[in-house]
From Swiss-Prot:
The gene is rpoE. It comes from Staphylococcus carnosus (strain TM300). Belongs to the RpoE family. RNAP is composed of a core of 2 alpha, a beta and a beta' subunits. The core is associated with a delta subunit and one of several sigma factors. InterPro entries: Asxl_HARE-HTH, RNAP_delta_N_dom_sf, RpoE. HAMAP family: RNApol_bact_RpoE. The keyword Nucleotidyltransferase applies. This is Probable DNA-directed RNA polymerase subunit delta. Keywords: DNA-directed RNA polymerase, Nucleotidyltransferase, Transcription, Transferase.
Amino acid sequence: MKIQDYTKEMVDEKSFIDMAHTLLEEKGTTMNLYDIIDEFKALGHYEDDEHLENRIVQFYTDLNTDGRFLNVGENNWGLRDWYSVDDIEEKIAPTIQKFDILDEDDEEDKNLKLLGEEEEEIDDQETAEADAEDDDEDLDDPQDEEEINDSDIVIEEDKDEMDEAEQLFEEEEDFNDDPDDDKI
């Protein structure tokens, strides 16, 4: 039976993974995961609901674990039967960056740049330039005085508060005096 002939009830009863197998067999070509899901939504007359979301999550899990399917890159899925073993290894093999092994002569080479060294050198240069600018700055710069005056920072000493603090201190000393001292 073709997938287009499925009724809503049949779509509800059949698993998405089996429907995906049928769909891919009919199409005969790889399909994007989202296109497969859109096809299922149209067949089942689904609207966005929690039941559909749960089925999609289960479908994606099954798609990754079911040995009949193969991810051929960029979220495109096909049937494993379509590919030879060599093709499968080529499509799913991770890409490995090859690096040359350094020998003692290479390590001593001043012109050789190792990975990440350029970034460190740029950071070091920027730091050195910033330090040089700070060293060149005049400490008696009138512009600094203007900036301080314009910053609206006001520091005032409140003499009343100081007097109250002193009074509290003196009162505490009176409490700490030994009563026997007054009798002497």
